[in-house]
């Protein structure tokens, strides 16, 4: 990607500088400043409608696919403003991967779910080795090594989600975004995904949106609490904002903002 003159500290892999995001005339989130540390798992939490998923999707330009969505401010990744007109969004999404709320394997074999994305991104190495490595990192190899030619749809929901994680890993991203990856899964599958995340943080930076407070507490190093306030014109609409960002331990044990304490204690949400 094209380098800009912007600089961030070495341990900061991604930075939002005064980011506001709108859908047409509706402002969804306003004036977000946030730094994501390399090698950390960061949770984005907050009530429905506060803009946390909108912010997550902005980190690899997935919002570009939504008509009339616009962003003001700067999103810096590796010294580059990813919203610079010269930057290829496809390359951004290769380096900053995404795992969605619902498992969405390709209608292909387990093997091809991994190989397909790598192939179209120009991978020319040992594909068998890449498939095995990706599945191992996603803690799925032992469960499917003898049925790689079976359809990805033949796997359970939790296995499908880990297949999607393996598919993301295969194209060698630096950051993995996860939008409520466990919301459709049972507790055992959720635990397996969380264990996988802890293994992945040794090689990747992970940013996750979750409504599950216990999950945020279990998996993340840092937590960003988003909230929403009514528009100044009083028309009933709300705009999201970053209310507090700190280590997960401090957010849950000694938050600075009263609204943070009220949210994590279940008083609203």
Curated annotation (Swiss-Prot):
Keywords: ATP-binding, Cell inner membrane, Cell membrane, Membrane, Nucleotide-binding, Phosphate transport, Translocase, Transport. It is an enzyme of class 7 (translocase). Residues 14-253 form the ABC transporter domain. One of its GO terms (biological process) is phosphate ion transmembrane transport. Pfam families: ABC_tran. It is found in: Cell inner membrane. GO terms for cellular component: plasma membrane. InterPro entries: AAA+_ATPase, ABC_transporter-like_ATP-bd, ABC_transporter-like_CS, P-loop_NTPase, PstB-like. Its EC number is 7.3.2.1. One of its GO terms (molecular function) is ATPase-coupled phosphate ion transmembrane transporter activity. It catalyses: phosphate(out) + ATP + H2O = ADP + 2 phosphate(in) + H(+). ATP binds at residues 46-53. It comes from the Bacteria. It is a peripheral membrane protein. Signal peptide: none annotated. Belongs to the ABC transporter superfamily. Phosphate importer (TC 3.A.1.7) family. Part of the ABC transporter complex PstSACB involved in phosphate import. Responsible for energy coupling to the transport system. The complex is composed of two ATP-binding proteins (PstB), two transmembrane proteins (PstC and PstA) and a solute-binding protein (PstS). This is Phosphate import ATP-binding protein PstB. It comes from Prochlorococcus marinus (strain MIT 9312).
